[in-house]
Amino acid sequence: SEMCIRDRDKYPAICGEFVWTGFDYLGEPTPYYTDWPSHSSLFGIIDLAGLPKDRYYLYRSHWNKDEETLHILPHWTWPGREGEVTPIFVYTNYPSAEVFINGKSQGKRTKDLTVTAENSADSASIADFKRQKRYRLMWMDTKYEPGTVKVVAYNDKGEAVAEKEIHTAGKPDHIELVADRNEIKADGKDLSFVTVRVVDKEGNLCP
């Protein structure tokens, strides 16, 4: 995906790119040999329910320049992983960002736009995830501790322009229903999609 995005940025004649697949789909179950009875693929950047996966935000940060993208992954609820290395990735349309765990800076990362398909194909570059550093901001040595992960994004002038937080979830407390619209037509055809979320007492999503 990184090199496809790079080519689109580099060559003005390219007007877009094709992603296999946009959505998960029924049939071609994967992995068919372990998780029986699988009935769906897992290749999409959006799942069967229409919910974006993490990788969706990598594409969104380049396809949608009119809106801010600032996405942290993974979630931060890992009971039993205390003290273990748990990498953090950030997908954003800004060039750099800084991550904080419970208020302590984990350092600032900047996209490396010098990375090309040619200079990132050797075994050392692959082992170092060099190709991914062109469009992803990665903190590979962060250690898990329950609490808050905060990301602060910076523009090309070094100014802090956006921030986002995710929190360790407690025990499931209640179910939250979120509709995608406030009104529907009473014509027997209109509809609304309702997202169901299991959250803790503070409203944090329970993974």
Which role fits each region the language model picked out?
Residues 1-3, 174, 204-207:
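Short, intrinsically disordered, charge-balanced linker/junction segments flanking boundaries
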Residues 85, 146, 172, 189-191:
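A general secondary-structure signal for short beta-strands and their flanking turns/coil
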Residues 158-170:
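Edge beta-strands of extracellular beta-sandwich domains
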